Amino acid sequence: MSLETSRLIQEQEWGHLITRTAQGDQAALATLYDRTSPQVFGLILKILNNREAAEEVTLDVYTQVWRQANTYDRTRGTPGAWLMMLARARAIDRFRAGAAEHGRVESLDAAQLFASDADTPEQEVEGQERRKFVQQALAVLTVEQRQAIALAYFYGLSQSEIAEQLQLPLGTVKTRIRLGMIKLREALAPYETGLVS
């Protein structure tokens, strides 16, 4: 059985479990948790970088699945993508709450947020190359620019929220993001035009 076929069967099983969960089947939710929680937990842990918080948020995700399984729409994406979207949203909410509570932001390694969800070994290799290239591009940024961009694009904070978290004027945050994005565009241009393989 090919990896692609195996993944398709897996997604079909998860979709069936979500449907049964929507009908109130607790055993289906338990099975869904057993099958998918390692991926969900892994994504949340990458965002929060705190095992205990990631465990709590993972449980929150499956509580949300129990309550909202009927909202899953197969036409809008795979069951795995839906679960990861819920996980990412919950993790970002927790990150924002923690950053607001502590009034600061922990060190950020934006490149670590490029989780691999490749279907084939070729896609995995391509993803690794892309992550390496993005890491190199991020290295051209100042620490301040990298931090502001990570908060905006990976953690979903608004520019006002970033200014508040970093205790900086809004204009400074906007400048850091704008200049950082210009540098990133220049650094990523060879990759986008296919000059880098």
What function would you assign to each model-found segment?
Residues A22-Q23, N49, D60-R76, A97:
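Sigma70-family region 2
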